[in-house]
Amino acid sequence: MEGTKKYISVGELEKHNQLGDVWISIQGKVYNVTDWIKKHPGGDVPIMNLAGQDATDAFIAYHPGTAWKNLENLFTGYHLEDYLVSEISKDYRKLASEFSKAGLFEKKGHTVIYCLSFIALLLCGCVYGVLCSNSLWVHMLSGAMLGMCFIQAAYLGHDSGHYTMMSSKGYNKFAQVLNGNCLTGISIAWWKWTHNAHHIACNSLDYDPDLQHLPVFAVPSSFFKSLTSRFYGRELTFDGLSRFLVSYQHFTIYLVMIFGRINLYVQTFLLLFSTRKVPDRALNIIGILVYWTWFPYLVSCLPNWNERVLFVLTCFSVTALQHIQFTLNHFAADVYVGPPTGTNWFEKQAAGTIDISCSSWMDWFFGGLQFQLEHHLFPRMPRCQLRNISPIVQDYCKKHNLPYRSLSFFDANVATIKTLRTAALQARDLTVVPQNLLWEAFNTHG
């Protein structure tokens, strides 16, 4: 009966936001997830970022209907006092329900078999070119094919991390490790750790790891005051070296993207051999060992060191296209400082994303991520459905006066460079005394 319900205020809920005492609210009911957070498949970071808050929209976005039954065991018996739902959230939940009833989350098409076949073809072509030809140009083409193989494998790894794209969870985990660890050398455990945090805290400067690139990049001037990364648990110091590198970031971004893959390799090893709890650590390490067995061996089959270096550079130059795409989706969008909030979750996703407009025949190249807002709103949606729901999302944003940015690949690059240039010029104009001799040498006048 209504009169027997127990209520707590929003202020009381907010007090339960520390490890060892974690409560969240979903559709007005309050749940104690203190112990569950240790078993949460998506890790502890997404829950901690929304601890002590209403997390309804985020829960709907990231969980299938079968997950709701798990909540009852976590129910505290309390309901949220004065629980209100904005019109934006009401419409979002209605959209999610309609898409679910239409079966869009289950209609996965033939993307997996097409992509796996394409990856196999690229890999076979690469190996054949390396082993069966003496031509430098064939070897460079082989490197490009391997780079495209890395891109397509990363897209499949991304898909498998968001939803079960295979016939079972066991096969899905195999696909994750195969495409992530074995084929690209990047741990799926590292990817899920950082990527889930990125989705929840999209474009939060101190909570979203995808924007924390000091000393190399700083998107807004907020980094110039030095921020504390809540994700990494350390200060992002804007020192003399950072000032120098950021001041030229609009010139260096594409070069950095070529070698950015090396950083991902390093991050993978740092996580897998850290003291942090890593799901399936042994399996991830085995997958990485597979990669670091076949990839160096393939490179060693080339006739000399000049060709080996050119092969790797060609390969990494192609994969740089994917790294660039990731920056286009977010760098020129709105940013903010502070934790994500569950009550305006949709608004933050819309403000922090940029779509890339392209013809449907190019969808394979972008892996569905050209529909960045659609993906952020419905991360469990198979990529083959994103183009279908795009007009509906556009109408939704128009109705609620929310931003819906869709730029061509060229225009998105221009917008990103302009954003980086603005921050670079601001970094040069800082009046603080340089602490880096390299900065002083490059900026000495007279």
UniProtKB/Swiss-Prot annotation:
Compartmental location: Membrane
Domain Cytochrome b5 heme-binding stretches: 5-89
Keyword Lipid metabolism found: yes
Membrane topology: Multi-pass membrane protein
Cofactor: Fe cation
A Pfam family assignment: FA_desaturase
Disulfides per UniProt: none
Protein name stated in the entry: Delta(8)-fatty-acid desaturase
This protein's encoding gene: sld1
